[in-house]
Amino acid sequence: MLDLFAGSGIMGIEALSRGAAHVVAVEMVHSQAHLLLQGYKALSLEKNLTLYEKNVLTLDKEELCAEGGFDLIYADPPFKDMDYPDLRSFWQWLNPGGVAVFEAPSRNMPAWVKEASDAGTVQVRRYGESSLVIFRS
């Protein structure tokens, strides 16, 4: 599982509890990355974690998934603090049959999400102020 903009790491921990073997988490804010690691250690899950303290938008695919892709990619960008990034490039990191789930603002939906939804490439599920953008490879 690839957890982008990982924050507290709770989505990765949840994925592990549901059978994921390993989580690659990416969080660029040092204090958040530290808390994420402490959470995994508190649950004795640090052996199942690879943590990168990097900017998601400048990641190198070869560095993160040298042995292949991911079955699940989850991203929850801090869209209140930044323009919502175009995350479609991460779809190519999925294994066949994999799923990418990105949180996006329900208001001011990014243009690329609207385009992908209109084309039938993604499903968008709205939950109040947030929406889930779901892509299946």
Q: PLM ranges: what are they?
A:
Residues M1-S137:
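Class I S-adenosyl-L-methionine-dependent methyltransferase catalytic core
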